[in-house]
Curated annotation (Swiss-Prot):
Classification via PANTHER family: ZINC FINGER PROTEIN, ZINC FINGER PROTEIN ZXDC
Protein name per the record: Zinc finger protein ZXDC
Organism: Homo sapiens
PTM comment text: Sumoylated at Lys-660 with SUMO1, SUMO2 and SUMO3; sumoylation enhances the activity of the transcriptional activation domain.
Complexes and interactors: Self-associates. Interacts with ZXDA and CIITA.
Composition bias type Low complexity, residue spans: 23-35, 84-97, 151-171
């Protein structure tokens, strides 16, 4: 249809400038049979806050409107509203420029016979028109024409949300979303801001993006991006100016928030310790440390007597009563634990899977935990955070955990609430840990090994080395540093094998049979050695062998004192030197106390004894009459003799497993010949002399087994000797040459004299030990013969040797290491110097000085 010509002049906006509705005008006349009217509307552009229209009436030609001062686009719309209630025809609009065309895109359809039927109530005709290639939405509601055009993308980003024009409807919202294709509107501005967050990623809203790979943060300003980059670099440029604080922050806002804490540090004061806190919450948390044992909140559930410190803990506990139907059960096979929360079940499952994701980052710690709470509790140890202090006056102890303080508080009450549940045991303890240690005594096996007090006058038995050690310190006044042998795990002896004080009547021949070689019908030396190694350290009471040590030797002799055990370990391939504690030869002799003669001394086989690793030692200079001589002694190579006397007690020889030790030191031809005539060891058991030692080494070497002496109370303990033996076994026999060179070097420097030899009718003097002959006489060796394979040499080593401090130890290919313990008094006589000129004779065997008794080194 053809539209009437539009006026070329723009229209004035009217009294209100801003898009609001104009002054109230009279409502349009009801649609009736009157002729159609023309309506003049002023349409505003989007620059003025959105499209809008103000209706106006005109009869006849419209007057020219006044000019508008604004720069916004305005155009005139002429409407023709038909009579009879038909749908109003949406007239096209045209800008006030000559020559522009109006294209009506949509209009109400009319029937063939006339106007269309009137629309139903509440239905407003709407359509779309295109003006100068711009789409506009047209809506006519109650005589008011509303035009709207969606803003372009560039306009949407620049236009700020403004209050929408108030239409005549009562429920029209005031703030519309500026995003394209979104027509939502909100009554309040903050609602629109929240809604705009859903349009994240819009172009131009966050142009400053983080350049780091993997970081998708974007910001509206460059300052915020710069502040964000500092978090990547771990920079904290804003430091607290308060002295002693030293904290730093990434932003000035965090620093200001921190400074408020300094300003409020003295607001909340603890009434107990006068400590101040910035917040009431921190004060309440601190006050719980003073009243931790008090649990004022009790569960009201019937049958539940649990108490809690805080109300929140009580409420958390109540869920266990009211949510029993929602328990989470552990699905691990064999575990039936249930939890009221899924998070607690998740933490519990980590105990089955071994997952411990929370790792302590402290230096050289490495502890891991299943939950963050346990990790935070563990960090208190590194920070020395002892927040739980004992409230008892004068105590002052503090703890890192509340349960530790609770256990400590019981000690102030004087009660022992933890009672042993075993029937018949009425032991009570103040700590649960003490009850746990006590309960292990009841579950020990009946046949568990027991250890006996090593003091000869004490017969106490113990089930653990700890109790035995405590007994030695408490009852026998032993110092802690003198009891290292009790630390060894092999110091326990089966109680069935301990000798009783009644087994004290033994003869000298019984003692020899006790250390006799392996019988012919035995399974072999290797098997015997393994049994000795597996059996541990055995103990023989000194009173059980007192008769063999001197007949009437009293056990409580004041010159001897309490005797420590002797540990015997076989070593046979180390040449003697000053670095070696004690070296004995083939024949080890037990000397009697008091005056002795050749016939009273019993010879013990060194091959059966093995190596002597630890001996008690005591200086007997205060008792010069302890060991004297009433006869002349002559040197003679004695051989081990077997006892033909029946043993009075057959159980004592069984205490020590007999071990056969093959000698590895060569003997001289003359000595070998004498051995054959004196019932010595067969020559076939001796290896070639060229295998281990040279000529000088042979002169200083011992016989079958090398015996190493170490005081039971010195720094070189039995345990260390055993460990060194193991190390030597790994290194091999490489220390033999070094020991020989050390010995030769000391001889050349004058620090050590070669062994002195004196031959007489009945004895040999070899080194520093006087070895009387056995009961069977034999031919004396020729004069000038050195101590060979069957000689005896003794060297004493102090607690701090001049060597490298490492106890030499070696093991030959056919040598075994039995660990044996014997309570035997051993006497080492003073070295007898050779007489100036003249042959060795009886006068050279006297004892000019005092003696040394190998007993306890206190």
């Amino acid at each position: 249809m053809d539209l009437p010509a539009l006026l070329p002049a723009p229209t004035a906006r009217g009294g209100q400038h801003g898009g609001g509705p104009g002054p109230l005008r009279r409502a349009p006349a009801p649609l009736g049979a009157s002729p159609a009217r023309r309506r003049l509307l002023l349409v505003r552009g989007p620059e003025d806050g959105g499209p809008g229209a103000r209706p106006g009436e005109a009869s006849g030609p419209s007057p020219p409107p006044a000019e508008d001062d604004s720069d916004g686009d305005s155009f005139l719309v002429l409407l023709e509203v038909p009579h009879g209630g038909a749908a109003a025809e949406a007239a096209g609009s045209q800008e006030a420029e000559p020559g522009s065309r109006v294209n009506l895109a949509s209009r109400p359809e009319q029937g063939p016979s006339g106007p269309a039927a009137p629309p139903g109530p509440g239905v407003a005709p709407a359509g779309a028109v295109t003006i100068s290639s711009q789409d506009l939405l047209v809506r006519l509601d109650r005589g008011v024409l509303a035009l709207s055009a969606p803003p372009g993308p560039a306009t949407a980003g620049a236009a700020a949300p403004r209050r929408a024009p108030q239409a005549s409807g009562p429920s029209t919202p005031g703030y519309r979303c500026p995003e394209p294709q979104c027509a939502l509107a909100f009554a309040k501005k903050h609602q629109l801001k929240v809604h705009l967050l859903t349009h994240g990623g819009g172009q131009g809203r966050r142009p400053f993006k983080c350049p780091l790979e993997g970081c998708g943060w974007a910001f509206t300003t460059s300052y915020k991006l710069k502040r964000h980059l500092q978090s990547h670099d771990k920079l904290r440029p804003f430091g607290c100016p308060v002295g002693g604080c030293g904290k730093k922050f990434t932003t000035v806002y965090n620093l200001k928030a921190h400074m408020k804490g300094h300003e409020q540090e003295s607001l909340f004061k603890c009434e107990v310790c006068a400590e101040r806190f910035p917040t009431h919450a921190k004060l309440s948390s601190h006050q719980r440390s003073h009243f931790e044992p008090e649990r004022p909140y009790k569960c009201d559930f019937p049958g539940c007597e649990k108490t809690f410190i805080t109300v929140s803990a009580l409420f958390s506990h109540n869920r266990a009563h009211f949510r029993e139907q929602e328990l989470f059960s552990c699905s691990f096979p064999g575990c039936s634990k249930q939890y009221d929360k899924a998070c607690r079940l998740k933490i519990h499952l980590r105990s089955h899977t071994g997952e411990r994701p929370f790792i302590c980052d402290s230096d050289s710690c490495g502890w891991t935990f299943t939950s963050m709470s346990k990790l935070l509790r563990h960090r208190r140890k590194h920070d020395d955070d002892r927040r739980f202090t004992c409230p008892v006056e004068g105590c002052g102890k503090s703890f890192t955990r509340a349960e530790h303080l609770k256990g400590h508080s019981i000690t102030h009450l004087g009660t022992k609430p933890f009672e042993c549940p075993v029937e018949g045991c009425c032991a009570r303890f103040s700590a649960r840990s003490s009850l746990y240690i006590h309960s292990k005594k009841h579950v020990q096996d009946v046949g568990a090994p027991k250890s006996r007090c090593p003091v000869s006058t004490c017969n106490r038995l113990f089930t653990s080395k700890h109790s035995m050690k405590a007994h030695m310190v408490r009852q026998h006044s032993r110092r802690q540093d003198l009891l290292p042998q009790l630390e060894a795990p092999s110091s326990l002896t089966p109680s069935s094998e301990l000798s009783s004080p009644g087994q004290s009547e033994l003869t000298n021949m019984d003692l020899a049979a006790l250390f006799s070689d392996t019988p012919a019908n035995a399974s072999g030396s290797a098997g015997g050695s393994d049994e000795a190694l597996n059996s541990g350290i055995l103990t023989i009471d000194v009173t059980s062998v007192s008769s063999s040590l001197g007949g009437n030797l009293p056990a409580n002799n004041s010159s001897l004192g309490p005797m420590e055990p002797l540990v015997l370990v076989a070593h046979s391939d180390i040449p003697p030197s000053l670095d070696s504690p004690l070296v004995l030869g083939t024949a080890a002799t037990v000397l009697q106390q008091g005056s002795f003669s050749v016939d009273d001394v019993q010879t013990v086989s060194a091959g059966a004894l093995g190596c002597l690793v630890a001996l008690p030692m005591k200086n007997l200079s205060d008792d010069p009459l302890a060991l004297t001589s009433n006869s002349n002694l002559a040197a003679h190579i004695t051989t081990p003799t077997s006892s033909s006397t029946p043993r009075e007690n057959a159980s004592v020889p069984e205490l020590l497993a007999p071990i056969k030790v093959e000698p590895d030191s060569p003997s001289r031809p003359g000595a070998v010949g004498q051995q054959e005539g004196s019932h010595g060891l067969p020559q076939s058991t001796l290896p070639s002399p060229a295998e281990q030692h040279g000529a000088q080494d042979t002169e200083l070497s011992a016989g079958t087994g090398n015996f190493y002496l170490e005081s039971g109370g010195s720094a070189r303990t039995d345990y260390r000797a055993i460990q060194l033996a193991k190390e030597k076994k790994q290194r091999g026999a490489g220390s033999n040459a070094g020991a020989s060179q050390s010995t030769q070097r000391k001889i050349k420097e004058g620090k050590m004299s070669p062994p002195h030899f004196h031959a007489s009718q009945n004895s040999w003097l070899c080194g520093s030990l006087v070895v009387p002959s056995g009961g069977r006489p034999g031919p004396a060796p020729a004069a000038g013969v050195q101590c060979g394979a069957q000689g005896v040499q003794v060297q004493l080593v102090q607690d701090d040797p001049s060597g490298e401090g490492v106890l030499p130890s070696a093991r030959g290919p056919a040598t075994f290491l039995p660990f044996l313990t014997v309570d035997l008094p051993v006497y080492v006589l003073q070295e007898v110097l050779p007489s100036s000129g003249g042959p060795a004779g009886p006068e050279a065997t006297q004892f000019p000085g005092s003696t040394i008794n190998l007993q306890d080194l206190q």
